A protein has these predicted regions:
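A short beta-loop-alpha structural element at the N-terminal edge
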Residues: 3-18
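Conserved beta-strand in the GNAT
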Residues: 55, 61-70, 87
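Conserved active-site alpha-helix within GNAT-family acetyltransferase domains
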Residues: 99, 115, 123-134
């Protein structure tokens, strides 16, 4: 299985928004308004200062995504990149999709001399914490 990782594009907005709705329900039991989420994803797509998406594709199908936000660190005189809003379609889990996205983020971070890459996981998302620690 070949996994292709790219930065999210306008044509990915709908699937990313659906992934976010699904992720919120699975991880936090939260019901999100799809239109609001779609508008939020669109806003980030149009302004990288709000966020940047990476998507994973298998055979042309988008099977996962994550959002990257940036935080300035005066301690390190550099940027921290925060990985958040990670979602992989259930049928593609435990196949290295997240790992592929993570490696793509880290490669880009290295090219841009980012101080640290960090992963945000909600404290109530016990399942996510277990996945990321493995």
């Amino acid at each position: 299985m070949e996994v292709i990782i790219t930065k999210g594009q306008i044509e990915d907005i709908e699937i990313i928004a659906q992934f976010q709705v699904d992720m919120a329900m699975e991880s936090e039991g939260a019901i999100l308004d799809k239109e609001t989420v779609t508008n939020g994803v669109t806003a980030a797509m149009n302004d990288e200062n709000k966020g940047l998406y990476y998507v994973a594709k298998v055979d042309g199908k988008t099977v996962g995504s994550l959002m990257l936000t940036r935080e300035w660190s005066d301690w390190n005189n550099g940027w921290y990149w925060w990985i958040q809003s990670v979602y992989v379609a259930p049928e593609y889990r435990r196949q290295g999709i997240y790992k592929s996205m993570y490696h793509a983020v880290c490669a880009d971070a290295k090219e841009q001399n980012v101080a640290q890459v960090r992963l945000y996981v909600d404290k109530t998302n016990i399942r996510g914490q277990k996945v990321y620690s493995s």
